[in-house]
Amino acid sequence: METVVAFTAIAVSIMIGLAALGTALGFGILGGKFLEAAARQPELAPQLQVKMFIVAGLIDAIAMIGVAVALLFTFANPFLTQVAG
């Protein structure tokens, strides 16, 4: 039983870490491409900014879903009931 809890803690750490890493990379790429496009066509910057914020929200939502699944495994571990019988 302790092994399941330990492996769950490791899995939760990996899930949250990869979600944070993916979000950071996504925001970095998104910001870089936005600045590149705004420098190329400054008159489109307001329209691009709105679209950038929409995509930023979607990128952040994926990380939040990963954190929610990690919290599910932390506090309501479905694997413990299978081991306990």
Curated annotation (Swiss-Prot):
It holds the Pfam family ATP-synt_C. It comes from the Bacteria. Its main location: membrane. The record marks D60 as: Reversibly protonated during proton transport. One of its GO terms (cellular component) is proton-transporting ATP synthase complex. The chain crosses the membrane at residues 10-30, 53-73. Keywords: ATP synthesis, Cell inner membrane, Cell membrane, CF(0), Hydrogen ion transport, Ion transport, Lipid-binding, Membrane, Transmembrane, Transmembrane helix, Transport. One of its GO terms (molecular function) is proton-transporting ATP synthase activity, rotational mechanism. InterPro entries: ATP_synth_csu_bac/chlpt (IPR005953), ATP_synth_F0_csu (IPR000454), ATP_synth_F0_csu_DDCD_BS (IPR020537), ATP_synth_F0_csu_sf (IPR038662), ATPase_proteolipid_c-like_dom (IPR002379), F/V-ATP_Csub_sf (IPR035921). It is found in: Cell inner membrane. HAMAP family: ATP_synth_c_bact (MF_01396). F(1)F(0) ATP synthase produces ATP from ADP in the presence of a proton or sodium gradient. F-type ATPases consist of two structural domains, F(1) containing the extramembraneous catalytic core and F(0) containing the membrane proton channel, linked together by a central stalk and a peripheral stalk. During catalysis, ATP synthesis in the catalytic domain of F(1) is coupled via a rotary mechanism of the central stalk subunits to proton translocation. Key component of the F(0) channel; it plays a direct role in translocation across the membrane. A homomeric c-ring of between 10-14 subunits forms the central stalk rotor element with the F(1) delta and epsilon subunits. F-type ATPases have 2 components, F(1) - the catalytic core - and F(0) - the membrane proton channel. F(1) has five subunits: alpha(3), beta(3), gamma(1), delta(1), epsilon(1). F(0) has three main subunits: a(1), b(2) and c(10-14). The alpha and beta chains form an alternating ring which encloses part of the gamma chain. F(1) is attached to F(0) by a central stalk formed by the gamma and epsilon chains, while a peripheral stalk is formed by the delta and b chains. This is ATP synthase subunit c.
